[in-house]
Amino acid sequence: MADTYLIRLSDVLIEKRKAQISASGFKSMTNSNHMCAILKDGVPISYGTNVYATNGCVTEHAEAQALRKLCERLGRTTKKIKIDILVVRTNGSNSKPCNRCVNYMDSLTGRFNINNIYYTDQQEVSGLRCVKFSKLLNEEERHICAYDRNIIRRYHGNPNDSLRSKSPQFMNSINPNTNHQASQVRCA
């Protein structure tokens, strides 16, 4: 997949999300505005955005929404589809999929063959990092989103660095700058 194409697509997603936010009047204090595109052969086949309920404790991350919408559209197909996932944040900072989203993706491996996960990362020259899904799935220290950290803090005390070293069973129990320089996005 052409690297410049991915960078352009991420810029388009960022602008699209900013337009949605502006039209809705939504004000975010956390810069947590993400968009996701599910790609088949480099072509977007499903989109998702982060959704937060202001009156309750319901969130749906962009990755989960895009995959859910794709599952709904495909219905009960038995054919396994090869896909890549692109996740971007409107402010261009890190958008690595969290533990809950990785677990959700893993639960769908019977329907999808997820190859690469592309996400915005400030430390990459191109602004995008590419990681094989299998590597992301097997990481010992997965990212935990702010919402889940707050739930853990509420019910299990203050999450500190030792939280990340908890057993995988505990971790799995958690409910499931846009001006980029053109350079190569390499998968780790």
Go through each PLM region and give its residues.
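Zinc-dependent deaminase catalytic domain
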Residues: 1-188
